[in-house]
Amino acid sequence: MEAVERIENPYGIRLRIFLQPKASRDQIVGLHDSELKIAITAPPVDGAANAHLLKYLSKLFKVPKSSIVLEKGELQRHNKQLFVPEPKLIPKEIEALL
């Protein structure tokens, strides 16, 4: 499975993420093996990192954070899989991987 995959029905983008919590800033770092590495400032405590990741992705894709689905990997840094339905905008870093 690719790090970034376009899905046609229902339309959206599926992301396989390697999450780096407690970073100096929120950013898409690039590919890490077969995953998209994303750094966020939130610590990996009590779901704060996942909540911050959803908020960050909702800003990038211009969708409500409640619409982003964490499909698997809630308690892992590797193999997080998210589905972003009907993104209004696709960031250039992610567009390059499609």
UniProtKB/Swiss-Prot annotation:
Q: Which residues form a coiled coil?
A: none
Which domain of life does this protein belong to? Answer: Bacteria
InterPro entries xrefs: DUF167, YggU-like_sf
What GO cellular-component annotations does this UniProt entry give? cytoplasm
SMART domains membership: DUF167
Q: Which Pfam families match?
A: DUF167
Q: Which family does it belong to?
A: Belongs to the UPF0235 family.
What is this protein's name? UPF0235 protein APJL_1398
What organism is the protein native to?
Answer: Actinobacillus pleuropneumoniae serotype 3 (strain JL03)
